[in-house]
């Protein structure tokens, strides 16, 4: 069929592509990943087979140090980046990291724009009810971050104040579930790092976000030296989410077992200052 495409149509396609701009957007990359694997989807007997037939695991993430981020040398790295790469080696596939909108992560997962959500994702009741998840692999907590010098005794001090969190995140859920924080002026942001920017700039009084990110990005020697953790709201754990009913989650659990046994996961936890789940 390709031989029958006319020069007119080829030109039209070129104009259409040019109108889209230069660099590919996240949605463009995700759409390409989904369409490029259509044949595998039709023939695969299971979700794991589908992934293996494609030869790659498409991983949805947001920029989040120390889990998935670009370091000073320009290398894409992080605890989850390295762990996912090690798991993919066990599965015999290549990792492909696609930046997503965290608030629509399950929608992108179900649409097969991505194969999994692997980005310091809290194992909430909602996630576990709507996806197939791995066992917990790392510990975390939701914390309150404010500017140094801010008077803070409890979440009651934030009633009526501006509080930010990432849309669709465990931080947002923590705000909604706290009697005092629920009375704050809540503003959602696209990513957790934007929350730190708002507090540092003084446009927000506090942020609720992951302890792992706060430990990596605030305090002495960081870009956010003026910020500090003042409260820990709740303990939680991270896991990886696949499509509901997927057998790939169990395969990743098996890979985790091997990577724990050979010391890989502990070495990564020490490298990125994280605590592995029990």
At which residue positions do the language-model features occur?
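Flexible hinge/capping segments at coil-to-helix
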Residues: 28, 146-163
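Periplasmic-binding protein-like
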Residues: 139-146, 211, 215, 219-257, ...
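Extracytoplasmic small-molecule ligand-binding "clamshell" domains
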Residues: 42-120
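Short helices/loops that flank or line small-molecule/ion binding pockets
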Residues: 89-90, 98-99, 103-117, 130-132, ...
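Extended ligand-binding regions for polar small-molecule ligands
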Residues: 81-90, 162, 169, 215, ...
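Ligand-binding clefts/hinges and TM-proximal coupling segments of bilobed small-molecule sensing domains
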Residues: 40, 45, 170-190, 225-229, ...
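A ligand-binding cleft/hinge motif common to bilobed small-molecule-binding domains
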Residues: 121-129, 174-177, 200-201, 205-234
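Bacterial lipoprotein signal-peptidase II cleavage site
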Residues: 17-37
């Amino acid at each position: 069929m390709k031989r029958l495409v006319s020069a007119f149509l080829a030109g039209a396609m070129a104009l259409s592509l040019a109108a889209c701009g230069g660099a590919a957007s996240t949605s463009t990359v995700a759409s390409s990943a989904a369409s490029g694997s259509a044949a595998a989807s039709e023939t695969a007997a299971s979700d794991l087979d589908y992934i293996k037939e494609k030869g790659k695991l498409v991983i949805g993430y947001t920029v989040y140090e120390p889990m998935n981020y670009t370091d000073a040398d320009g290398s894409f790295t992080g605890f989850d980046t390295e762990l996912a790469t090690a798991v993919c080696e066990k599965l015999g596939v290549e990792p492909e990291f696609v930046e997503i909108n965290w608030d629509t992560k399950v929608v992108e997962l179900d649409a097969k724009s991505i194969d999994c959500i692997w980005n310091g994702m809290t194992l909430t009741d909602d996630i576990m009810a709507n996806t197939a998840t791995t066992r917990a692999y790392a510990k975390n907590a939701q914390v309150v971050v404010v500017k140094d010098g801010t008077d803070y005794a409890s979440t009651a001090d934030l009633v009526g104040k501006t509080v930010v969190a990432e849309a669709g995140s465990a931080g947002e859920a923590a705000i909604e579930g706290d009697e005092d924080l629920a009375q704050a002026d809540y503003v959602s942001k696209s990513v957790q790092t934007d929350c730190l920017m708002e507090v540092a700039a003084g446009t927000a009084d506090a942020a609720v976000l992951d302890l792992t990110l706060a430990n990596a990005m605030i305090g002495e020697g960081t870009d956010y030296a003026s910020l500090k953790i003042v409260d820990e709201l709740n303990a939680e754990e991270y896991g990886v989410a696949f499509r509901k009913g997927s057998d790939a989650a169990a395969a990743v659990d098996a890979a985790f077992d091997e990577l724990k046994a050979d010391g890989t996961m502990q070495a990564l936890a020490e490298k990125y200052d994280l605590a592995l789940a029990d």
